[in-house]
A protein has these predicted regions:
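Charged, low-complexity intrinsically disordered terminal segments
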Residues: 1-220
Length: 220
């Protein structure tokens, strides 16, 4: 189970270039799922990865097509960041929907990304997000400051790994997030207690600094 704030490669590729970290991560998740069709893989994603409804990011589409359960976290059930704006948005703007693929406003991330509608932008102005970065398997949990995000590739990050009873608490929290987002993380007690079940899916992110630049590695 992965809960991830930034899971994308969205930036102006005409002006900058970063390693294709998010693409490679997506490829490896899909590869692992294809190798083990019965393996349950869940990705909880923040709406900013779809530019607040302007489109569905190809990484998300590819994961869904591979049988990975992608749950878009319903950030609009969270407490209002701007209580002077969100009630107005909910009353006057949200009822009109959030069109996808009908943009006419140039994308500030560059021309390689879909154009935006005014309603996409007004939706983003609620400034709500799921900032958590959690990786969980049957025995271990990793909580990190790192995003699966190309422009963040060289950032310095920290992470903590734990096992034992705490993993059940983390799982319960992830299940609650999925439930209020109209999704479901279907993990039974029997599955929780399996020993060495697909231990290769443990996602470990290690950050270290070389010549003042942090390098990101992951193991699937």
């Amino acid at each position: 189970i992965i809960e991830m704030f930034l899971f994308n490669d969205i930036y102006n590729k005409d002006k900058e270039h970063f390693p294709e970290f998010a693409k490679e991560y997506t490829r490896r998740l899909i590869k692992k799922k294809m190798e083990n069709p019965d393996l349950k893989v869940y990705v909880l994603s923040d709406e900013n990865n779809n530019l607040y409804g302007a489109f569905e990011h190809p990484f998300i589409t590819d994961m869904k097509n591979a049988g990975i359960d992608v749950i878009m976290v319903d950030i609009f059930k969270l407490k209002d960041t701007f209580p002077w704006y969100s009630p107005i948005w909910r009353t006057l703007i949200a009822p009109h929907g959030n069109p996808q693929g009908k943009g006419w406003i140039g994308n500030f991330y560059g021309p390689m990304w879909p154009k935006l509608t005014l309603r996409n932008l007004l939706r983003a102005l609620n400034v709500k997000a799921d900032h958590r970065k959690i990786f969980l398997n049957e025995e271990n949990v990793v909580v990190s400051s790192a995003n699966i995000h190309d422009p963040s590739y060289f950032h310095e990050n920290v992470a903590i790994s734990a096992n034992g009873e705490i993993t059940k608490d983390v799982l319960h929290g992830l299940q609650l997030v999925a439930e209020f987002s109209d999704g479901k993380i279907d993990v039974t007690e029997k599955q929780e207690n399996k020993i060495n079940f697909y231990m290769n899916i443990l996602i470990t992110i290690v950050f270290y600094q070389i010549n003042s630049k942090s390098q990101s590695f992951f193991l699937l």
